[in-house]
Amino acid sequence: MSDEIKKNNYSADSIQALEGMEHVRMRPSMYIGDTGVRGLHHLVYEVVDNSIDEALAGHCDTISVIINEDNSVTVEDNGRGIPVDIHKKEGVSALEVVMTKIGAGGKFDKDSYKVSGGLHGVGVSCVNALSDHLRATVFRDGKIYEQEYERGKSMYPVKQIGETTKRGTTVTFKPDSTIFTQTLEYSYDTLAGRMRELSFLNKGITITLTDRRHTKDNGDFEGEVFHSKEGLKEFVKFLDGNRVPIISHVISMEHEKGEIPVEVALIYNESYAENIFSYVNNINTHEGGTHLQGFRMGLTRTLKKYADASGLLEKLKFEISGDDFREGLTAIISVKVQEPQFEGQTKTKLGNREVVSPVSQAVAEMLENYLEENPNDAKIIVQKVILAAQARHAAKKAREMVQRKTVLGGGGLPGKLSDCSEQDPAKCEVYLVEGDSAGGTAKQGRDRNFQAILPLRGKILNVEKAMHHKVFENEEIRNIFTALGVTIGTEEDSKALNLEKLRYHKVIIMCDADVDGSHISTLILTFFFRFMKELIEGGHVYIAAPPLYLVKKGNKKEYAWNDDQRDLANERMGGSAAIQRYKGLGEMNAEQLWETTMDPEFRTLRQVTIDSLAEADRVFSMLMGDEVPPRREFIEKNAVYAKIDA
C-alpha cells in the first residue's frame, strides 16, 4: 500500500454510515447468503475481513481467530483500532456507528482504505445484528475501550476500561440461535481452509487459528498458524502438491498496471485438468470474470506466439485452441479493485471491463520473460500443448458420440435405466446404484412415479488419471450423460455443461456403507467435479445414507447409522436385541431399502456442496491422483471419521 494511505488520519470522520440495520434480522439471507452452515461461517469471515483491510492498508500484520468453548468466536488484530471519538453526524462514538449501522466503516472512505474485502460488504454491524451477544474491545491511543451489544443494540455507551501499550481491535460474538436454527457448531476445517487461503493471498500476514473446544495430547488447544512468505507462489505449490510438475519453477509475478495490483502464479503438471482460481480483493470469484478473461488472453497469445516462432506446430494438422494451452495448468490470479462490480448467479463474477487489459499485459510480460530465460521449460510446455490438441481432437469425436446417444440427439436411454413416469424434472430423482443386484432391489423398492434407477457396473473410470477422450469412450460414463440428458458442447468455446434438459433435479449416489462403497462414491464424485461441476453447483447432487445396523427384538425394530445409535437402540429395547450389520445394499430387501434410504419422509440425504473450489481440487487430486504419500497422510489424519469394515 502507498505511504499516502498510511499517513492519512483514521478517525470518526473516516466512518461513513450508509443505512440502518432494521432489515438484517428480518432478512438475514440478503446480507450473508443464508442462515445455514455457510452463513454461520460467513460471520467469522466478515470480522476477519475488517482486520485484513487494516493489513492491506499497511497497519496490521497479525490476526488471531479463536473458537471458544461455547462456540462463540473471538477475532483480534494489531491494527489501528476502530476509532472511538464522537461521530459528527450520528452523535455517538464511531465504534458504535461501525457496530450498529449497516455499511458503516472506513472501507467506504477511499482515503482510509484503497481496496476492501468482503463479498457482501456488510461488515461487523451485520455480524452484531445476527449475534446473541457481541463485545468489542479497542486498544487505541494508549487506552482500552469497550462496548457490548445484544442482538445488535448497544447495552451501554462506549467506555474506557483501562490503559495499554498495545493497539488493535478484539471482537467476540456468539451467533443468535433464533436465526441460525440449523447449527451453531463451527467447523475447524472450514475456518482453517479460509484462514490458510487468506494467508496465501496476503503474504507476510500471520493468522493464528485456535480451537478451545479440543485439547491435544500435550494439553495445548488444537490450532494452526498460517503465514506465507511467498504468497501465490506458495499457494500454487500447496494446491499442486499431489501432482507431478513438468517445468522446473512456479512462474509468478506481482505487478501494478493502471492502479490495479495484479498477482499471478502458475505451473504446468502431468494432469489433464485445467485449474485456475481467481480472486478479487480476497474474494474467490467462482464464476470468473474479466480478470480471468485477461489472464486467458495473455496466456494464449504469448504461448501461441512462442509456439509459432519455434516451428514446433508445423506438423500439426489442425488449429490449436485456447483450451490446449491450459491443459495441466494450475494458476491463481489475484487482483485488487477499488470498486468491484459483481455479476452472475452467485455474484462471484467480476464485471469491471477496465481489468482485462492490465491483467492480460502483466501475464504476457511475465510469460515472455520466463520462456526466453527457460528454453527447456518453454519446449516442454509447447509439447504439452501439442499433446493436448491431439487429445482434444480425439475427445471431440468421443463427445459427439455421447451427444448422438443422448435424448437430445434422438437416441434411446441406457437399457439398464429404469425410468420414472413423472415428466417434471423438478419432481424427479435418479439413484446411481452400485452393482446390478442392489440395483434390482432398488428398482423393486422405489416409487416408480418419481424415482429412476441407474445401476453402475462396479467401479467407474478414475477420471483423475484418464485422458479426456478415454472418459467419453467409457460406457458407464456415457450412460450417466445419456440418462441425465445433459450435454457437453462439442466446440471448444462451449464445453460448459448444458443443464437445460436435465431430466432429474436430484441425482443421488447410493453405494454400500463400506470401504468399497466409499471408493465408488469418491470415483463418481470425482467425475462430477471434473466434468459436471455445474451439477454440483446447482445443488443437484446428493449422497444417500443407508443404515449400518438393524436392531431388532420381538416386534420392535430400529435402524442405526452408527455405533452410538446402535447401542442406544439396544438399550431402549432392554438389551440383548438381535443386531444385523449390513455389509451392502444387497442385504436389505426392497421394503427395508425404501423405508431407510429412499422414502423422502424418513431418509437422510447429504447434499454435495463446494465451499472452496481450490480445496476441493486439492483433495480430489490427492485422493485420486498418482502420489501415494500425501494420500496416506490424509487417510491417516481422517481415519478417525471413517467407519472401516474389516
In which residue ranges do the predicted regions lie?
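Conserved, non-catalytic sequence blocks in retroelement Pol enzymes and Pol-derived host proteins
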Residues: D85-E90, H291, G322, H469
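Residues immediately C-terminal
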Residues: D53-E54, G81-I82, V515-D516
